[in-house]
Amino acid sequence: MSIYLPPRGVHQVRLPGQRIANEAWRTGRPAGRIGDRSQSGYHAHGCPSCPHLGVGPAVSGSPNVFINNREALRVRDVGTALACCGTNLWRAVEGTSSVLINDRQAHRKGDGTEHCGSARGSLIDGSPDVRFGHA
């Protein structure tokens, strides 16, 4: 039997002929990527009589880190909320403190976003097979 000693903070054991059992996989959340959507509650700006549900994809990400061939999302990356009348951008405001991408926290499914400058939301999509941090 051989034991694989992973980097500190990652709990993995590899046995011959077996897949790696990774604690981060079981406890982490799906990694955010460019194109993954964020959603906020209904909010109105630009046209107060017409509140919109803020939903839209991320449009910026890491220039050199890719997840499933898509740019990885980090805190402060932005997306667009397609139905809003006024400023229609959202921004990633939360991420995992255990994974940094380009010196910024990795943004994951369920992490908080700020829509149109004030409305709170969260990332609702993520990678099917890459997870970061602890839930």
Describe the predicted segments one by one.
Residues 1-135:
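Intrinsically disordered, low-complexity proline/glycine-rich segments
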